[in-house]
């Protein structure tokens, strides 16, 4: 990656896991962004060990040894997933026009940064594109001859976006009743099972029965008809499954530690901007499979299903 001069700011979202934070930071260190914006949640009041863990995670950032402007937005108290991530990204996009975003357990391939930077520039003024993601959940199957494809699913384990897109984030989901009652999800999703699945999730989110910022971001993108760019092969691995995780405790999850590949340049751009319906159907069936589950199960699934920031604290607040 040293032969590519990264110019895009990088935002890093951290909490209380210095071990995984250090691995993510090392990937960022190799990329050498000129600006690093760090968002950190505070310790949970009922977890005394959080104080030292949060300090240790923040200390990792002191390892910046390249020419870099480091900006920090650290909370002294625990805001929870929804409020910390959304307020942190509000700060990020008040500060910069566009950014590459990583959370504290998402390790990227070196070419992930160039992939994001080139596409941030390429689609900068194209309102149809809301998110550039480094995730590919096709599980090793090559689906297109191009470098990437367009999807409705804005996977967020390593992603990038612009201020122009993030401005539509609505943490209150104020348009949900109108979308629900007008059956607009059918127009968006087209398939009955997908509509049932996401109606249940969005209703629970609207009712504040989970603490997910990611579901709210997905809803915000969908009602703006925003597309996500997904690479033809996976560029980011989530290393946060297993011991120490709150909602990714299952080490054998199909989504845990998916292998990374390097992107080949120059990028081969698709000649049209159309959502790949068949690939989205595969993702729905293999990752977001519609089935009945309780709200307690929903709170455990939040962390990995939309690929969002660590839902640490949600389970403890519910107990």
List where the protein language model places each region.
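Short, basic, low-complexity termini and linkers enriched in Ser/Thr/Gly/Pro
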Residues: 1, 305-319
């Amino acid at each position: 990656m040293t032969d590519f001069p990264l110019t895009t700011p990088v935002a890093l979202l951290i909490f209380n896991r210095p071990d995984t934070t250090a691995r993510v930071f090392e990937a960022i260190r190799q990329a050498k962004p000129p600006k690093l914006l760090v968002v950190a949640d505070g310790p949970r009041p009922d977890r005394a060990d959080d104080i030292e863990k949060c300090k240790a995670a923040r200390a990792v950032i002191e390892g910046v040894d390249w020419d870099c402007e480091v900006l920090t937005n650290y909370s002294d108290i625990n805001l929870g997933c929804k409020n910390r991530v959304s307020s942190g990204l509000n700060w990020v996009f008040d500060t910069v026009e566009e950014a590459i975003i990583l959370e504290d357990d998402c390790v990227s391939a070196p070419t992930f940064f160039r992939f994001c930077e080139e596409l941030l520039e390429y689609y900068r003024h194209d309102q149809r594109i809301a998110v550039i993601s480094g995730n590919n959940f096709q599980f090793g199957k090559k689906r297109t001859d191009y470098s990437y494809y367009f999807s409705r699913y804005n996977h967020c384990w390593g992603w990038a976006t612009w201020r122009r897109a993030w401005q539509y984030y609505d943490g209150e989901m104020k348009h949900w009743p109108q979308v629900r009652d007008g059956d607009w999800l059918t127009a968006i999703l087209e398939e009955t099972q997908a509509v049932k699945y996401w109606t249940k999730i969005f209703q629970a989110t609207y009712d504040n029965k989970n603490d997910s910022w990611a579901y709210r971001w997905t809803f915000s993108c969908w009602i703006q008809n925003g597309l996500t760019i997904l690479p033809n092969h996976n560029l980011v691995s989530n290393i946060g499954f297993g011991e120490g995780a709150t909602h990714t405790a299952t080490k054998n999850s199909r989504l845990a530690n998916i292998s990374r590949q390097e992107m080949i340049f120059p990028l081969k751009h698709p000649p049209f901007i159309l959502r790949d319906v068949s690939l989205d159907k595969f993702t729905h069936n293999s990752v977001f499979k519609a089935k009945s589950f309780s709200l307690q199960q929903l709170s455990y699934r939040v962390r990995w299903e939309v690929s969002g920031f660590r839902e640490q604290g949600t389970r403890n607040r519910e107990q």
